[in-house]
């Protein structure tokens, strides 16, 4: 949560003069020359959520034509992948600045693509630093419904306005037609705006969802350093040292891409640490995890563990100033208690992490408490209606445009 999201400033096409400058690269046209929905997800978790949503959409509307700026999961689900945006995901203010030119070019190419090909809707999936600015640019370009055009702008998975930059809700109401949230408490965060907001349930609790992790007291320790290159490079070495200080025989690590696999190998893990690609079901007796999406998966599975966070010092200092929440892990935030103790920056020492693993594996009361907390999480996030997010999207696409600012 203290991650400084991709903050791209002043990314606007020069429209006052009407001049269209040549772009460093262009996105390919949609498959078959036509498109109904453009999905945009810039992180691995968003790619997974988008893929699940796309499969549900295909079950309800098999003729729907979907293009995507996303990743391999959305491509495998049937999306026409224009660019693998997940391979370009960065974290932290310093890292964003280093990649500014690339993101500016991508931003402008995306605006141009939407102007030319006019999908019925653009579905933004999380990734607010890029996506919210794109929604604003589409309004200013008079492409979106909010700007007087004909492209609906929809957002799936709310930005964490309850953690920082709460005033974004007003610009979201101005630029978006509707928002679907995956956490029930988020609906109230927009109660003072005109933005239509609906809780559609968390995708991890969908009826067809197969959890990627499960608890097994005889299984190895699970180490989850995350899905972003810079974050993994900072977190994985300390996870390794904590595991080695604990003295367990084996550990497993799940990686989402070949890029992250290379980062893991660069840390020279011992032979007792097995690197596994995503896709299967991994058993674990305890987990040391980053604060990302997989931490919630582990919590829902009832695996005892802890959250570990290390960032660029400048990024962390800025995050402490901006973020106004008591916890980093989403499970802790939802429960309003530390289901997963958090070890942040200098507190994430090998000795502290080894002690945490001993507690997770050796204390039966810890496991029992984790099970109770996991059930509370499931009750909090469950949505009784099947395929709610897909139904929401199709309903929004069928509604008559309302060209009014929020």
Q: What is each residue range found by the language model?
A:
Residues 1-406:
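Nucleotide-activated sugar donor-binding and catalytic core shared by glycosyltransferases
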